[in-house]
Amino acid sequence: MTETVAGKAAGEKRDLLILGGGLVGMTLALAAATRGISSHVVDRADPAELTAEGFDGRASAISTASWNLFTNIGIAQRLEPLGCPIESIAVTDQMKPGRIDFRPEPHEGTLGRMFANRDLRLALFEAAAQQPLIAWHPNARVTDRDRSEHGVSATLADGTVLRAELLVGAEGRASPTREESGLGLAKWGYGHRAIIAGLAHERPHEGVAWEIFYPAGPFALLPLRDDSDGRHRSALVWTVSEKDAAGVMALSPRAFLAEVTRRMGDIYGTVELTGDRSSYPLSFQHTARMTDHRMVLVGDAAHGMHPIAGQGLNLGLRDVGALVEVLGEARRLGLDLGDAEMLRRYETWRGLDTFSVSFATDV
């Protein structure tokens, strides 16, 4: 949606006020639109920066359930040629003999698809721009949130006031909406950081995702599609201790690749970097509740986990699927979308799943 159209829609009271227009927040807006539910989507980031080449080297494993959701909101066809099927997962202890392979039965298809986060953002943003039920407000900072008996509102830094029936916190781990609500949060750090890098390599990966365990943490290689030049590619997620992270990031490209090769052996032959490296701290967090008066949390705003199982985004997308089902039922029954009983249904539906998956991946 263009800035002009979003500006015209600013005065309209919409059904949802989604704060956070990332992968989970924008998917929610698109999924809600399939049920005729309108939304304001507010994000402080610049879409041009988020979709720029080299901005974010991260990639995500998309499960079958998440792929079905993408199909329902109309972006699967655009994404299909950009994804790489995960045919199997190889797990090994420091490349020692005794590798374990997890491979689905022939009738089960693949273990998921790998996508660069940039490609996911581009598909979501393009779809949102074409959806009249979504008023998108990028480059916008929220200065005030209000929840009353009759609705919710958010005031932006430029004085614009957005109104809706239900407030959705989708800003990620540091969600201001969650913090302002006072919901309890269990949180602890792991004392590790994930080093992220894109690799090009001599030999094809054949759809294999590698999980190589070292004392300091897992070293993962996730298969990506070959690039336009035909280079075989993988995404690297290398877990290092917090005390070693700065040193690893400071290594020259040549020294960094030498360390990478030492840990992955010769499985892909010669490797090279395809872009800049990045790193982020690893931690666990989970809210005591995912709902409050006229408010719900989705994605990392409600739960954040170790990336070892690659389930963080998929868990957030399951939040989206459940919330849209609940909201669709509320709309069918003629209820206010902020109805407390309907929100309790979402809380009950998602609470056990998010709690069990989060703790199962707590390392």
Stretches with model-predicted labels:
Residues 56-80:
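N-terminal glycine-rich dinucleotide-binding loop that anchors FAD/FMN and/or NAD(P) in oxidoreductases
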Residues 33-56:
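Glycine-rich FAD pyrophosphate-binding loop
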Residues 11-12, 71-72, 82-180, 188-193, ...:
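Conserved N-terminal helical subregion
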Residues 325-363:
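C-terminal helical "tail/cap" subdomain of flavin- and related membrane-associated enzymes
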Residues 14-41:
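N-terminal Rossmann-like FAD-binding beta1-loop-alpha1 element of flavoenzymes
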Residues 246-341:
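FAD/FMN-dependent oxidoreductases across multiple families
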